[in-house]
Amino acid sequence: FGVPMTPETSAIALVYFVQGVIGLASLAKSFFLKDELHLSPAEAAVVMSISSLPWLVKPLWGFISDTVPLFGYKRKSYLCLMGVVGCVAWSTLSQGVSVVDNRWTASFLFAVGSLSIAFSDVLIDSIVVERARESEDNSTTGSLQSLCWGMVAFGGIASSYFSGELVEEKGSAFVFACTAVFPLLIAGAAFLVKEERKDFSTSSEMVANVVVSGGEREEEKNVSVVEAGKETLSTLWSVVKQKQIWGPALFMCLWQATPSPG
């Protein structure tokens, strides 16, 4: 892909691979809801809709990681946490109807599983953007993007190839158990990410480190979590007010709202 395979680059590739291969459970979810929980198509659709909610509020996860550091890190600690959370959710689902015996429990666990991937997606995207800004070579930025999407595609193809046979031969519980392994790869990848640990705590309050842009100059300052949140919201609002993003935003909205055969 034209990108030096440093430990951090390997971590980025691994997280994107997990985003693709996590689709291994897609078919198993449908079979579990219809064949084991005996839900109607309408009820199953509601459960699947609830499970997709974490993807609809992705900006919220970015806002949280930027303003509320965890154990001195904004990226690594959340990546590790989401990996563990996802593993727990899928492991619980692998216990079958003996534990997950109603649609609400299934909805919650599917949503938590989606949260682990959606949150990780936001975190790894921010890391890719940061590395792209640090690089002076535009070709490296393009190669990094190619690597990311290539790993997602590879993971998706692999999961599509094996998912049907695994569900048929082993059942949905086995597939959920296999899926539980993949979030742990995200947790492991977190330790390969380069991020300097910072002491965000003072004697009286937790503080966050934010970047303040001023023309072509950027500087960092330590502020309270509340002030960091206000700073981030102010920055987001200044971006939303720019008319040049309205067109692309409208296109994305219409694209997502339009029915598709997939």
Regions found by a protein language model. Give the residues of each.
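Intracellular loop-helix junctions on the cytosolic face of multi-pass helical membrane proteins
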Residues: F1-T6, V88, S94-S107, F119-V122, ...
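Helix-loop boundary and gating motifs at the non-cytosolic
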Residues: F1-W55, W246-F251, W255-G262
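Transmembrane alpha-helical cores of Major Facilitator Superfamily
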Residues: F17, S49-L53, V84, A111, ...
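Residue-level hotspots within transmembrane alpha-helices of multi-pass secondary transporters
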Residues: A28, P59-F63, Y161, G188
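Interfacial helix-cap and linker-helix signal at transmembrane-aqueous boundaries
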Residues: L33-K34, S65, P69-L70, F162-E169
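Membrane-interface helix-entry/capping residues at the boundaries of transmembrane alpha-helices
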Residues: M48, S65, L79, T141-Q145, ...
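Cytoplasmic membrane-interface "Motif A"-like loop-to-helix N-cap segments
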Residues: T67-G83
